[in-house]
């Protein structure tokens, strides 16, 4: 079983410790995988936000303590990689303080990815995202365009659990998009 599938299974069963251990081992054994770092950041950020996890407890503390170090390690390797820039920026817009950056810096990471790869439909989201958490028509149209493009949906799915989560968030915005 590949690590993305294994991670998905662990997250589905809410086996947080094994998920953390898996990703620590994956980035240790394959530290050239952007997707590994992106998914590791995703679970490090998501675990403390899970309703079943005591946000003051040991598991949340361990995830919070590890997140910035993992982010810094990945950033030192991938600061010019558009995939890393977009996905880490997207993740950081949820809880930018955990990444020790401000919201504008998180948005700029996404924007830099778009400038580097303007043909990537997903990265266009950086141009229309309204980070005041109100969604305007341009944002909705962009999500519908993303979801109606099979290549873009496939690109998102291939990222692993972080991509599946993005698609989960996007699906309610679409009535006729790819699901």
Report the location of each language-model feature.
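Amphipathic alpha-helical repeat scaffolds of TPR domains
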Residues: 1-5, 30-54, 79-96, 119-134, ...
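Alpha-helical segment of the N-proximal tetratricopeptide repeat
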Residues: 2-18
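Extreme N-terminal leader/anchor segments
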Residues: 178-179
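Acidic, low-complexity intrinsically disordered regions
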Residues: 12, 83-86, 151
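Helix-boundary capping/turn motifs
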Residues: 11-16, 63, 80, 119
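Alpha-helical repeat scaffolds
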Residues: 20-26, 54-77, 101-114, 137-153
């Amino acid at each position: 079983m590949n690590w993305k599938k294994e991670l998905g299974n662990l997250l589905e069963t809410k086996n947080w410790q094994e998920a953390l251990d898996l990703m620590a081992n994956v980035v240790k054994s394959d530290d050239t995988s952007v997707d590994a770092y992106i998914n590791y950041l995703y679970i490090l950020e998501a675990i403390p936000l899970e309703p079943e996890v005591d946000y003051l407890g040991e598991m949340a503390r361990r995830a919070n303590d590890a997140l910035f170090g993992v982010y810094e390690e990945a950033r030192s390797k991938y600061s010019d990689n558009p995939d890393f820039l977009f996905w880490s920026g997207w993740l950081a817009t949820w809880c930018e303080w955990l990444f020790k950056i401000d919201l504008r810096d998180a948005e700029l990471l996404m924007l830099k990815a778009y400038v580097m790869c303007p043909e990537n439909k997903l990265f266009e989201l950086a141009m229309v995202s309204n980070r005041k958490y109100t969604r305007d028509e341009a944002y909705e149209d962009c999500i519908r365009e993303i979801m109606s493009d099979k290549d873009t949906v496939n690109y998102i799915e291939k990222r692993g659990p972080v991509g599946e989560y993005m698609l989960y968030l996007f699906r309610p915005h679409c009535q006729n998009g790819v699901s």
